[in-house]
Amino acid sequence: VLPTVEKMLRSMPIEEMCSYAPIGGIPGFNEAVQISLFGHVSERFHVESVPTPGGCGALRHAIWNFLDNGDSMLTTDWIWGPYRNICEEHGRFLKDFPMFNDQDGFNVEGMEDGLRELLEKQKQVLLLLNTPANNPTGYSMTKEEMDKVVDVLKKLAAEYPDRRLTFCLDVSYIDFDGTFEETRSIFDSIHDMPENMMTLVVFSMSKSYTMCGMRCGAIVCLAETKEAADLFK
């Protein structure tokens, strides 16, 4: 445990530590999440955050709220095993695509093929990517790869205007790979997203602050408009 985290926890009144928190989080929670993620309160996005029991709780919210019963979520073939369990527990399924191409880079083409297959038969499609520091491979997508992913998503959103696309980034290990500026560069690719698309971030403060057993996380919406952020909330 980081000494600064332990010091802060031990300085808190026991009543504050043990009492119920509001469903929407204590005052200042949304700003605190943004500062942890971006280093400041975002001016690029309309951001809303919902507290969850760790990153796992955020994943559950994404799968339950942004897929219909019987739908499949798309992700890579290298995954944290409980992704599949969470899907199946909530009446959803997991579809994967090969994570790496022949050049050992991220397989954008395989991702697009998987998305097209789901868009043909589902009204809602959820793409989940775990980066930086993918569990279990440790792979971090480059800025160029993330740019290509977002370009594909924008193209498909335009081709399927009656579908609802959700792009979910699981950044549970974002603070375990590279400098703050390097790891946050993945967010630079996310801009000018279409109206029929939602961008979510799975954030695990439990991991970032080295207190995994305390189960503190958030599902975060990065919206282009206030109306979209309010709808998420």
For each predicted feature, which ranges?
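Conserved core of the PLP fold type I
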Residues: L2-F167, I174-M193
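Short beta-strand/turn micro-motifs composed of small residues
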Residues: T75-D77, L169, F203, C221
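Conserved core segment of the aminotransferase class I/II
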Residues: H191-K233
